[in-house]
């Protein structure tokens, strides 16, 4: 049995994919007999026992204008908790304050893995398009990560690209450290069986339901959802766009939808997992407009629910869908509206089955087993370290 610790910032009540991935992988590690601890930021210091392991919250301030996300600055407290837990392996889902714990782990002969949850080059381009020497700065930051950790885990080829480019441009060989390990999906909880006819009528009357689950921040490009709704209105496609999520752009988006009288409903962040499962299964199409998604867990949950997906052709979701269960398109609202209209002329039952079948190729158990194999963690392979 191994003791595996996973540390992360930006993990909280509204974290979405990161929180789901960490909790789900931890649960599979636990099912396989390992001890797991998650260390994350919180409103106060708190230790909670969960079915998937121990969650240690370290008191941390809220990042201004982030919509409630927190970041841990007291890394000594994190180190204290790690010493008490005595991990055999340390997983890191952070490029900022917590990355320095990789140095501590190295002094303790603890192997480490860094998870590339985002394309930092794309995030910087979205928020700081005119920043000088962007590529050099990003390469420097990524090189520091590569030097600090034993493994770099990307969920898709798209997520791995900036590290592959770093290896190529600097004549480095990161292949021994870099691995592709897709995420999974809860195929029991997310199912076409959750489709709810009463819910369909309640949220869209007799209109087709377009569903989007996203964070309302610049890098997710939520404004494009309203462009699509406007284009559907112009071409006469009778739809109701239901948007689940929250973030710093909420007021701006709501104001625009009201001003333009768009067929859009904002339902906020969905914390009820059962309600989310019903929404995903009741929707006719799932719209994933984020241009720089490195996996797209919500899109995979939609497929598991039997709901086809339209995504941006620049994101990693193109690696998740195929032509039988989804479409990838550029940022052109008229083309999205046309595809939406044409989609409803197709065999919806067959497409739903293809969507579910594609999702069944992904599982959390397989994700966890692949990671453990990569990390060379087997049953009974570790002794007490401290």
Regions found by a protein language model. Give the residues of each.
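Conserved donor-binding/catalytic core segment of Leloir-type glycosyltransferases
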Residues: 202-230
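Aromatic "clamp/platform" in nucleotide-sugar-dependent glycosyltransferases that forms part
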Residues: 291
């Amino acid at each position: 049995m191994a003791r595996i610790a996973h540390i992360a910032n930006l993990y909280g009540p509204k974290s979405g994919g990161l929180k789901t991935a960490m909790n789900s992988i931890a649960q599979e590690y636990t099912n396989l007999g390992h001890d797991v601890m998650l260390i994350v930021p919180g409103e106060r210091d708190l230790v909670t026992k969960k079915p998937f392991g121990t969650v240690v919250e370290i008191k941390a301030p809220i990042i201004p204008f982030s919509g409630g996300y927190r970041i841990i600055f007291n890394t000594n407290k994190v180190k204290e908790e790690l010493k008490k837990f005595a991990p055999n392996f340390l997983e890191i889902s952070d490029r900022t304050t917590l990355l320095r714990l990789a140095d501590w782990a190295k002094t303790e002969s603890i192997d480490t893995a860094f998870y590339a949850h985002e394309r930092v080059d794309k995030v910087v381009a979205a928020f700081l398009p005119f920043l000088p020497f962007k590529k050099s700065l990003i390469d420097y930051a990524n090189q520091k990560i590569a030097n600090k950790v034993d493994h770099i885990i990307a969920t898709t080829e798209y997520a791995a690209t900036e590290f592959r480019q770093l290896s190529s441009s600097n004549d480095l060989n990161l292949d021994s450290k870099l691995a592709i390990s897709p995420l999974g999906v809860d195929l029991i909880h997310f199912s076409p069986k959750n489709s709810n006819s009463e819910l369909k009528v309640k949220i869209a009357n007799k209109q087709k339901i377009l569903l989007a689950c996203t964070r309302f921040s610049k890098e997710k490009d939520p404004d494009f959802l309203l462009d699509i709704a406007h284009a559907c209105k112009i071409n006469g496609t009778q739809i109701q766009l239901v948007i689940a999520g929250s973030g710093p752009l909420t007021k701006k988006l709501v104001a625009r939808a009201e001003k333009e009288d768009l067929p859009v409903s904002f339902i906020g962040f969905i914390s009820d997992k059962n309600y989310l499962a019903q929404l995903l299964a009741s929707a006719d199409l799932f719209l994933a407009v984020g241009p720089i998604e490195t996996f797209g867990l919500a899109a995979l949950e939609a497929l598991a629910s039997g709901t086809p997906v339209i995504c941006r052709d620049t994101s990693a979701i193109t690696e998740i869908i195929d032509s039988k269960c989804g479409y990838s398109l550029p940022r052109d609202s008229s083309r999205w509206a046309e595809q939406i209209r044409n989609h409803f002329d197709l065999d919806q039952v067959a497409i739903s089955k293809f969507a579910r079948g594609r999702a069944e190729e992904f599982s959390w158990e397989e994700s966890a087993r692949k990671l453990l194999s990569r990390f060379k963690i087997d049953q009974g392979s570790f002794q007490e370290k401290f």
